[in-house]
Amino acid sequence: MNFELTSAYKPTGDQPEAIAQLTDGVLQGVPAQTLLGVTGSGKTFTIANVIAQINKPTLILSHNKTLAAQLYSEFKGFFPKNAVEYYVSYYDYYQPEAYLPNSDTYIEKDLAINDEIDKLRLAATSALLSGRKDVVVVSSVSCIYGMGNPSDFYKNVIEIERGRMLDRNVFLRRLVDSLYVRNDIDLNRGNFRVKGDTVDIYLAYTDNLLRVTFWGDEIDGIEEVDPVTGVTIAPFEAYKIYPANLFMTTKEATLQAIHQIEDDLTKQVAYFESIGKEYEAKRLYERVTYDMEMIRELGHCSGIENYSRYFDGRAAGTRPYCLLDFFPDDFLIVIDESHVSVPQIRAMYGGDRARKINLVEYGFRLPAAMDNRPLKFEEFETMAKQVIYVSATPAEYELIQSEGIVVEQVIRPTGLLDPIIEVRPSLNQIDDLMEEIQLRIEKEERVLFTTLTKRMAEELTEYLLNNNVKCNYIHSDVDTLERVKIMDDLRQGVYDVLIGVNLLREGLDLPEVSLVAILDADKEGFLRSHRSLTQTAGRAARNVNGKVIMYADKMTDSMRLTIDETNRRREKQLAYNEANGITPQQIKKARNLSVFGNATSEAATLLTESKAYIEPSSPNIAADPVVQYMSKAQMEKSIERTRKLMQEAAKKLEFIEAAQYRDELLKLEDLMKEKWG
């Protein structure tokens, strides 16, 4: 199936030329191109048009989950009939394993997995292995982290066809091999149940059940059904069932891996003993031996990813498999906000290695743990055969890689001009700002301030609140979901002013903002570099009255570059508008575009309606004396019920309540171990 672009708009301004140049470059096999597009010029729409014309599977790489979600939503809108998937880290919380030798502190791995994102990740890999060409995967830097071997994943795909002869028990065993779990009582994602000749499979990568009906040893019917109502959604003549987990292996591979691990353990223990590290040798022997027993008995152990090289059959030092391996040979990578994303890709390997060196040197892990890692930057470059870098401020690396192939997109479809930039002295800057804020409030417009420190952002917020200005701040200490809510509140008018440090830059789509104030603009550094100033100024480019005020006592090179480049673009935009009789139009954009439909607004509602914490809202189950007299089956049922309550509370963002259920769960599990082992 080919890509089918759906949009009420047609390419205008610089877009038609940009689309043509980028498309020609990709079709001619040009390895790297750069799209230099100003804020609000429709870069996403341009890329969507390129994808539709080249008809290749495409990876869109963004530097954080929030922007990835925004892009996913936009591409879903452009390609409703095609496979647009989302692949980011599925951890709601992740504390990596680490050892701090200075204080002799071992930090155990701790995590919480988001079930919904896990489903979306599986949907992405399943779409890529389906053989479709019309696949767009929007991803964060997670795409370069290790995952299962795609060939092992594909070997466990179950193909069924109506009318084919297939023993039902053989089919059930194949489901188990694909890591589906039988559960005839409570069917959840990744489970299946059997009722007579009917097998219901809750697919791990969709929200639907697959119902397979047998007539003896013949497949009589295949249909997707609604898991709640049981109503048939669609019948099928044939169907591919993809595995329930990204990490697949076989019994033979597991046994071979255990033998290799034990051989390497013997060598590493002997090495530690030869250099006088008897304690490390003993620690390593005990930990790895315990892990091997767990794998033999249960098929997994805590930290099994550190043995991934053995299960994948890779040689020492070779790169891990990652999402890029699931793409066909001929695919396109689009790196959004490349001036930030590329350095992030480059840094991942070094950070991971620095943490694991201590774990290996002090006997917590085998050296093979070093091979459970993200790609090195050089490995990523080798796999990225065709790349389009997208940025309003591309860095030197992108320009060198593109070898001069830079496609400029300066004209906005709305006719909006780059904002006017004024430089004002820092003396009495707050009084000056108060006057500017009042002017914007009268017009029902919004204001962004950017400061150099979190403390300054908080103190400025307090000052403005004391002067009856509706405002709030966002910085790295404010969690992601709360940031989304605050920015949405700004658009709604709950706040007139938003103050931040480094979060008011790439990708924030706030058309109501007509003024951006940059405090301490002359303090050269990361936050006041040419690229940072240009990106920050761009936040005012989506408003017809857009204006930027830089408060500074001297003109720095970064300020001069930003002002000169902005003026050059304004001249080009003005000339185009005059030549084509275009009057700038204010952008009007719907709020709350989200990965999960209206999840952002639902989350915001849940946040505002959260229960006040006064006392535990449910009785302490583990403290109930009746628990001591429960049978094993009753205890297991109680544990499962508590786990579900915890997950439901977390889904509703009732985190205090979820934490209470978590504590109950741990107590019940401890009681279970005490009584039955």
PLM segments and residue spans:
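N-terminal cationic and glycine-rich segments that engage phosphates or anionic surfaces
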Residues: 87-432, 436-442, 461, 495, ...
